[in-house]
A protein has these predicted regions:
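PLP-dependent amino-acid enzyme catalytic core
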Residues: 2-479
Length: 479
């Protein structure tokens, strides 16, 4: 247990420290920054040995409780244990291990993150977040209005995690017509009086901009008790740190062995948790950033230039959850890379990013991206995804979704630069992207039994224009 775990904003030069519970229900810091621990807790070899035994004997929830205690000191340990065990149960998760790891081929593994209720990796963080929110709201006697944006998987994971919970309403913005039929059915088929689906004109980043504008209106945020579940919420990252540790423990037989991860990446949330785990001292070798055609992050890790794309330059791809023009969690990594220089980060992300981006190509810190922080990157195309899905299915008998295929393709392309086992983090089950799977394999993906009725469900969704005030009015009218 950390003596005093406190959190600071990436843009706060005074490093004002606040508790986990005080950042849990919010998203952005008041100054527009993102929260990170004032110091990362450190993992020792003895802790890894204990956790390896714990994972083997008591399972994923027990490991999660121990990791959470490193980051949270204002919720009693017994309560954290109960929260973790409620979040990670079988059959809510379809596999008793919660996050099983299987071998794909020599030197490469799949970390199965999609066994949850909506078949996406985001269930792992969202189920924990739902428990945290309900616990903290009950403790405070308060209610919460969640306003979020999704390109597909986040929204359904959030809605299923928050559905039926006391004192929580959800308003989820989606880009109209940009999600797969299965994703739409999952979200819009949920019949809950406290869940509101909004189909917004535009792309995912337009949805995210509206959410940020709503959160930036301090009076509106206070009046309607607005909270966030998008990947900028710190509690989601904490939840994701756990599965990096569990995957590491599954693959590495001793603490001397290092493991690398290949992570399909859009918003830099999933791989940011890997960065945090590495900074904690978990023996992670390389962190491989795998993008699709929307290669904002690959471009940065190759050139040092972070160039925000316009909506018109954001491609609609067959791995749509990664169709982003800028990465909302990236600020956290840049804060660490620049020696936690809050003034510089505030300038980069508060001033330069809204004007199109920045470059660190000539900054001495950029050389640390690979050497100190372990990052590699690559991008993938639709043709790459189809070939990778077909190869995994025909040669290995394993069906993967298009986002996971991006991760596998990029990892294979960098195999000569990585001399440690690579865990490719799965992002979703193939059923969520049936069109691309059929194109690649000639057959429909299997539909897990738990989803057999979803496509016939009545739809619950409201179409709105890309207008912050109209969205605010809708929230106010239904809050």
């Amino acid at each position: 247990m950390v003596d005093s775990m406190r959190y600071i904003s990436t843009r706060d030069e005074s490093r004002t420290e606040i508790s986990f519970s005080d950042i849990l229900l919010g998203g952005l810091a008041p100054d527009g920054g993102l929260y990170l621990p004032a110091e990362y807790p450190q993992v020792t070899g003895d802790m890894l040995d204990r956790w390896r035994k714990l994972l083997n004997t008591q399972g994923y929830p027990a490991l999660a409780a121990e990791v959470l205690q490193l980051f949270i000191d204002d919720i009693p340990a017994d309560d954290l244990t109960a929260i973790a065990h409620r979040a990670y149960t079988f059959p809510k998760f379809a596999h008793a291990e919660i996050v099983p790891v299987t071998k794909l081929e020599d030197g490469m593994y799949i970390g199965h993150l999609s066994e949850g209720p909506t078949a996406a990796f985001k269930d792992i963080a969202m189920q924990l977040l739902g428990e945290f929110f309900e616990y903290e709201l009950r403790r405070r006697g308060e209610t919460l209005t969640i306003v979020g944006a999704t390109s597909g998987d986040t929204g359904s994971a959030a809605e299923y995690a928050m559905s039926g919970r006391d004192g929580i309403k959800v308003f989820m913005l989606t880009p109209a017509g940009r999600m797969t039929p299965f994703q739409q059915a999952q979200m819009f088929g949920l019949n809950d009086p406290n869940i509101f689906n909004i189909a917004l004109e535009g792309v995912f980043d337009d949805c995210q901009d509206v959410v940020k504008a709503v959160s930036a209106d301090a009076d509106f945020k206070r009046a309607h008790r607005i909270g966030a579940v998008n990947s900028i919420n710190w509690a989601r990252l904490v939840a994701q740190v756990v599965y990096y540790i569990s995957c590491y423990l599954h693959v590495a037989t001793s603490n001397e062995q290092k493991v690398s991860f290949s992570v399909p990446t859009g918003n830099f949330g999933d791989i940011c948790a890997g960065h945090i785990a590495k900074q904690m001292g978990v023996p992670i070798d390389r962190l491989i950033v795998a993008t699709n055609e929307n290669d904002v992050l690959d471009e940065f890790f190759r050139t040092g230039g972070y160039r925000v794309r316009s909506s018109a330059d954001t491609f609609e791809t067959s791995s749509p959850s990664m169709d982003i023009s800028r990465a909302s969690n990236f600020e956290r990594f840049i804060y660490d890379l620049l020696g936690r220089d809050a003034a510089r980060v505030a300038d980069l992300f508060g001033t330069q990013v809204p004007q199109g981006g920045f470059t660190l190509a000539d900054d001495p810190a950029f050389s640390k991206v690979g050497t100190q922080y372990g990052f590699l990157s690559g991008s993938s195309t639709h043709a790459d995804r189809v070939v990778t899905i077909r190869d995994c299915y025909e040669r290995l008998g394993i069906m993967i979704d298009p986002h996971t295929a991006d991760g596998v393709k990029v990892a294979r392309g960098l195999r000569n630069e990585v001399d440690t086992p690579i865990v490719c983090l799965e992002t979703a089950l193939p059923v969520k992207f049936a069109h691309t799977i059929k194109e690649a394999t000639g057959r429909e993906p299997d539909l897990p039994d738990r989803f057999t009725t979803i496509m016939q469900a009545e739809r619950h969704v409201t179409d709105l224009p890309n207008d912050v005030d109209v969205v605010k009015d809708f929230i106010a009218a239904n809050d």
